[in-house]
């Protein structure tokens, strides 16, 4: 299955730990990520000495305001280097997997957040998936900036 790489970054005028702490609660993604409608089945654990959180969520794909498809996705986040980095794996239908790494670098009085995403998707779906991921992640980061700076 082909792999597609995406990268996003944003500067937010808050301490790195504040941004990191906000994103390590999966419920905070509702309202940040425009497709998510809710988060459920949240489970906390540990993997290789790192704290983890696993959960399920639903993405609602709309066309002209009408929900056409609800996509249940499974997510696992490993907090690899708090408060500097965490990694998330997203599993979605049909056999789409996203490996996402967030890094939080203090800069001036705020934080530079960098998101690196590897999208594993069938070639026939790749353009839709990468375009949608790009659109959604840009909105997520802009919403995060707005939420944390106001």
Residue ranges, per PLM feature:
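Hydrophobic ligand-binding cavity/cleft-lining segments
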Residues: 1-51
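Short, solvent-exposed secondary-structure boundary motifs
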Residues: 1-2, 29-35, 63-70, 90-95
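Short beta-strand micro-motifs in enzyme catalytic cores
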Residues: 4, 51-53, 100, 111
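Short, surface-exposed coil-to-beta transition loops
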Residues: 5-7, 68-75, 96-101
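Beta-strand elements of well-folded, non-transmembrane domains
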Residues: 12-16, 57-63, 79-81, 92-96, ...
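Hydrophobic pocket/interface hotspot
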Residues: 18-23, 29, 77, 113-115, ...
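Glycine-rich portal/gate segments that line the openings of hydrophobic small-molecule binding cavities
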Residues: 41-91, 143-150
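Beta-strand/loop substructures that line and gate deep hydrophobic ligand-binding cavities in soluble
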Residues: 87-138
């Amino acid at each position: 299955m082909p792999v597609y790489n995406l990268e996003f970054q944003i500067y937010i005028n808050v301490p790195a730990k504040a941004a990191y702490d906000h994103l390590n609660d999966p419920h905070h993604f509702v309202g940040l990520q425009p497709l998510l409608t809710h988060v459920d089945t949240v489970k906390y654990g540990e993997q290789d000495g790192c704290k983890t959180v696993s959960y399920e969520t639903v993405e609602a794909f709309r066309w002209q305001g009408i929900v056409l498809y609800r996509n249940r996705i499974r997510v696992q986040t490993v907090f690899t280097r708090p408060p500097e980095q965490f990694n998330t794996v997203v599993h979605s239908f049909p056999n789409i997997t996203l490996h996402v790494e967030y890094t939080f670098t203090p800069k001036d009085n705020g934080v530079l957040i960098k998101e690196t995403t590897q999208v594993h998707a069938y070639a026939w779906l790749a353009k839709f998936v990468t375009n949608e991921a790009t659109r959604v992640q840009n909105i997520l980061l802009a919403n995060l900036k707005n939420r944390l700076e106001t």
